[in-house]
Structures are given as structure tokens and as C-alpha cells.
């Protein structure tokens, strides 16, 4: 059974009364499609994959390379989907909490995964329990990642959405305890429930319209989080169980979009930064939100200050994949 919640009693308390916001829909314009960055790396041979031409879906990876570069086409048919079972060969159940007959070493230790821009959809949990997976470079402008795509990938460190992503769905990186870098182009419509639950993130810049309940719950190493402007809904339980948090930076946010649910963090040292041009009335409202959620214990913890980050550059992909000899 997947560990969706950190502790039952905690989440019963946290989630009581929470309404999950309706997903925002967004279409990709033709101009945006034309501007896509194409995957520059040579794909693995077509015969390394079982492929259903009718649905344009990869149904199984049967190759032996631990660094997997998905082809754009197989038999001249575009690769658009990846099924749930496609990477069953790379799932490590031995080092999970699941009952299994699998023996040590009976899985492919996939290290690096590169996805082409032709992909449109990947089924829920398609890479769950791929514990050896360290790096994912996604060129596909996915409208939705779907749920639990990389949940419990314990070795996952770096994920880059080169052409952006529409929605980062529930439990996307839940329990990816070694995850340090997640980068995406532009603004996402939604960061789902427990999307980054119990990850190893230490500093994080978030550019999103909607941030759902418990989005960052239990990220014990997270010290600093920057929320970009343009947020339309922020559920305060996103900050639950951030025991090491030092700074929450709001780079321009309307207090009315903050859902002040009970968090009970009661952190006496965290600083909440708001822009210098925040009015006294807005400052008071933001303070009330954090205080009523029991995130802070002293009103002086909410302060005006400089917190606007410069543009967050995309990590050096060539350098990252070069470590795998790609």
C-alpha cells in the first residue's frame, strides 16, 4: 500500500474540511508548440520497446540499457503515451514496503530517463518504485503529469521539465527523499495534493497558479521556499510539517487567495517575507492567515523585505546527462 500520508492522525487533523480546488484547463497554442525545445539526444533502438501502434503507446521496455532515451517514433508512428506497466522491469519491490517475491537484483537499475517532446501522456504511477532512477529530463509539454508518476523513487535527485508542464498532479514526487532539484519552464496551473510530500528539497522556487493541500508536507530539509506572484489559490496546509523551514517568501500575493486551514506548525523562528510595497492592511491580513493556521506564534515573524528572486535558469542538462556518458 502506497504511503500517501505521513501519519494518519496528523493528516486527519490537517485535511479536515479541506476542499480540493477545481483543476484549471489550459490549451497549448500552435505558436507555443512551434517553440518547443526538441530532445537533442539519440534515442535507444526501436526494438528495445514493445509498442502498440493503434494507441501510440509504449507498453514495455525490453532493452538492457540503464540510461533510457525514449524514441520519438517507432515504425514511423509517433510515440505519444507510456503505459503503467511499461517499466515494470525497473521496479524494485525488495526495498519498498510492499510484500514481494522479487529477489535482490531481479530488476533493471534504470538511472537516467529522457522523454521526447512527442509524448502526450504517461499513466499514473508509471515509474513508482524505480528506486535506482536518479535523473529525469522531460521534453514533453505534458498537460498533466498524472498521479504518483515518480512516487517513492528513493534515488531520484533531479527532474527537469524543459518545455514546462500544465499540472503537477497529486503525489507526483511523494517520498522521493533524495530529490534536490525540480525545474520547469514558466508557470504551472496546479501543484497537487502531497505533490512534493517528504522530499529532500532544501530550497525551492515555486511558480504556480494553484497550490493544493499538503503540497510540500513533511519536507524536513526544506529551509527556504519562494512563492512567485500570480498565485490564485494557496492552501496553507501546503506548509505542514516543515520542521526545518526558516524562510517563506511571498513574492506578491493577495491574502484573499490564502486558505487558512489548521497547520499547527507553531514555528517560533520561521520568517515570512512579503514585498516592501505591501500595504499595512495587506501585511495585517497575511499575518492573520499565518497566525490562524498556527504556522507562526508571533506576529513579528511576518516582515516586509526583499525576496524577489532573479530568473531561475534551467540547470545544465548536458552536464547532468554527461555524467552518464550520454
Residue ranges of predicted features:
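A structural signal for leucine-rich repeat
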Residues: 150-151, 196, 216-217, 239-241, ...
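Sec-dependent signal peptide cleavage junction
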Residues: 18-32
Amino acid at each position: 500500500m502506497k504511503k500517501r500520508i505521513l501519519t494518519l492522525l496528523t493528516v486527519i487533523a490537517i485535511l479536515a474540511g479541506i476542499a480540493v480546488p477545481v483543476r484549471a484547463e489550459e490549451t497549448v497554442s500552435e505558436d507555443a508548440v512551434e517553440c518547443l525545445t526538441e530532445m537533442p539526444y539519440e534515442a535507444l533502438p526501436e526494438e528495445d520497446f514493445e509498442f502498440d501502434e493503434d494507441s501510440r503507446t509504449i507498453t514495455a521496455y525490453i532493452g538492457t540499457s540503464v540510461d533510457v532515451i525514449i524514441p520519438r517514433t517507432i515504425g514511423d508512428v509517433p510515440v505519444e503515451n507510456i503505459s503503467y506497466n511499461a517499466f515494470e522491469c525497473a521496479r524494485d519491490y525488495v526495498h519498498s514496503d510492499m510484500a514481494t517475491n522479487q529477489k535482490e537484483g531481479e530488476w533493471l537499475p534504470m538511472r537516467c530517463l529522457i522523454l521526447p517532446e512527442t509524448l502526450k501522456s504517461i499513466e499514473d504511477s508509471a515509474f513508482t518504485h524505480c528506486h535506482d532512477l536518479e535523473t529525469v529530463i522531460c521534453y514533453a509539454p505534458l498537460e498533466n503529469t498524472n498521479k504518483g508518476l515518480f512516487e517513492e523513487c528513493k534515488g531520484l535527485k533531479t527532474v527537469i521539465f524543459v518545455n514546462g508542464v500544465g499540472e503537477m498532479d497529486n503525489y507526483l514526487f511523494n517520498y522521493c527523499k533524495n530529490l534536490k532539484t525540480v525545474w520547469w519552464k514558466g508557470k504551472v496551473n496546479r501543484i497537487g495534493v502531497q505533490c512534493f510530500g517528504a522530499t529532500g528539497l532544501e530550497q525551492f522556487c515555486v511558480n504556480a497558479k494553484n497550490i493544493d493541500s499538503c503540497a510540500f508536507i513533511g519536507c524536513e530539509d526544506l529551509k527556504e521556499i519562494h512563492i512567485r506572484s500570480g498565485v490564485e489559490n494557496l492552501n496553507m496546509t501546503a506548509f505542514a510539517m516543515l520542521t526545518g523551514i526558516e524562510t517563506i517568501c511571498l513574492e506578491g500575493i493577495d491574502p484573499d487567495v490564502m486558505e487558512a486551514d489548521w497547520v499547527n506548525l507553531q514555528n517560533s523562528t520561521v520568517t515570512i517575507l512579503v514585498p516592501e510595497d505591501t500595504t499595512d492592511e495587506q501585511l495585517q491580513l497575511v499575518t492573520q492567515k499565518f497566525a490562524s493556521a498556527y504556522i507562526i506564534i508571533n506576529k513579528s515573524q511576518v516582515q516586509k523585505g526583499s525576496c524577489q528572486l532573479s530568473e531561475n535558469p534551467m540547470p545544465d542538462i548536458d552536464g547532468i546527462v554527461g555524467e552518464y556518458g550520454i
